[in-house]
């Protein structure tokens, strides 16, 4: 299969620039992958698609305000850093602008001097390893000085940065939000739990590679970025019990899917507590191990995420669903509407 097989025309005005006032007021396209039937609903009605004994699996990662603006200590010239991942201790891999002026040994100061960094290594493509120096707790300093790194297709400024976090976000480490979870409110989750559905949390820290376009024609040549994931023993035990009792594992978003399927692939279809790095690429032809249904937002043309959804529901049905959504003026991407596929 080729990348072009997953292309579609998306009018730019359908790219949501801001979140809706109410999280669960977004639209929900329900797709039956067996019959091809589609229903236009609102997100709150996802509760009608869940049965007692099912497990709803969510990614509890929290987005870091990972964009930092500072000055070179020597010259006072402006520097922008985007934190990518914590490599060890206080060292981080970052994207730097302007990178060519940041040599090993360059010192950078941020804000009122509560945070500083020194470049320890030069990488390719504007990448650097920097070591941060600070007082108190790093994440607290970052929360006060950093800005949220919104996706490249969002041009509006975000008034409330919590709207780019899920209501259950707690494990800091992502460069982007697991956006399928943005639709849930605490009230809706309480209703779902009261129905007898198990709420299960895992962690996958979303990397910036999630926005990287596929640059090859042949899908077999595409290399996925790696992301850190973690599933606790308690969560794994709940999911095993759900499966044993005939319930479904319903994933919220592609990050939850990739974590569950990574673990299922690693342990011959069994669900076990695990942590590590995954670069799983789920595309048509993939044999599913764990996930029975899922919700997800609407993704970019030719993206690996459209390919993942197509692996579950079939390429033609997914493209039909996308064309339907465009005709019905669904909102796309991170702050957009959602679909539920079962």
From Swiss-Prot:
UniProt-listed Pfam families: Queuosine_synth
* Keyword set includes Metal-binding: no
Pathway, per record: tRNA modification; tRNA-queuosine biosynthesis
Keywords, comma-separated and alphabetical: Cytoplasm, Queuosine biosynthesis, S-adenosyl-L-methionine, Transferase
Main localization is cytoplasm
- Leading EC class: transferase
Report the catalytic activity: 7-aminomethyl-7-carbaguanosine(34) in tRNA + S-adenosyl-L-methionine = epoxyqueuosine(34) in tRNA + adenine + L-methionine + 2 H(+)
Where is it located? Cytoplasm
Name one molecular function that GO assigns to this entry. S-adenosylmethionine:tRNA ribosyltransferase-isomerase activity
Cited SUPFAM superfamilies = QueA-like
Q: GO annotations under biological process?
A: queuosine biosynthetic process; tRNA wobble guanine modification
Q: Briefly, what is this protein's role?
A: Transfers and isomerizes the ribose moiety from AdoMet to the 7-aminomethyl group of 7-deazaguanine (preQ1-tRNA) to give epoxyqueuosine (oQ-tRNA).
Q: State the name under which the record lists this protein.
A: S-adenosylmethionine:tRNA ribosyltransferase-isomerase
Organism this protein belongs to: Streptococcus pneumoniae serotype 2 (strain D39 / NCTC 7466)
């Amino acid at each position: 299969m080729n990348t072009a097989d997953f292309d579609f025309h998306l009018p730019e005005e359908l790219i949501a620039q801001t979140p809706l006032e109410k999280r669960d007021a977004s639209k929900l396209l329900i797709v039956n992958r067996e019959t091809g039937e589609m229903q236009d609903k609102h997100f709150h009605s996802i509760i009608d698609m869940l049965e007692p004994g099912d497990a709803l699996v969510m990614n509890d990662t929290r987005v870091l305000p990972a964009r930092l603006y500072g000055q070179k200590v020597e010259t006072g010239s402006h520097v922008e850093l985007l934190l990518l991942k914590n490599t060890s201790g206080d060292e981080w891999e970052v994207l730097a602008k302007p990178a060519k002026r940041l040599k090993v040994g360059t010192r950078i100061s941020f804000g009122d001097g509560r945070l500083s960094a020194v470049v320890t290594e030069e990488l390719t493509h504007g990448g650097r390893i920097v070591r941060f120096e600070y007082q108190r707790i790093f994440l607290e300093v970052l929360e006060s000085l950093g800005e949220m790194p919104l996706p490249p297709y969002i041009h509006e400024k975000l008034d409330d940065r919590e709207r780019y976090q899920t209501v259950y976000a707690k494990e800091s480490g992502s460069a982007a939000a697991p956006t399928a979870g943005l639709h849930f409110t605490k009230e809706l989750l309480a209703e779902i739990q009261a129905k007898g559905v198990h709420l299960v949390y895992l962690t996958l820290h979303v990397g910036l590679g999630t926005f990287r376009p596929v640059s090859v024609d042949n899908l077999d040549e595409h290399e996925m970025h790696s992301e850190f994931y973690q599933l606790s023993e308690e969560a794994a035990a709940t999911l095993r019990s759900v499966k044993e009792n005939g319930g479904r594992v319903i994933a919220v978003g592609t990050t939850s899917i990739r974590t569950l399927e990574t673990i299922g692939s690693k342990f011959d279809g069994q669900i076990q507590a695990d942590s590590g790095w995954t670069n799983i690429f789920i595309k048509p032809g993939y044999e599913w191990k764990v996930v029975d249904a899922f919700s997800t937002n609407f993704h970019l043309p030719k993206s690996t995420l459209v390919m993942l959804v197509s692996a579950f529901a079939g390429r033609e049905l997914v493209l039909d669903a996308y064309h339907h959504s465009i005709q019905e003026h669904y909102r796309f991407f991170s702050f957009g509407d959602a679909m539920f596929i079962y």
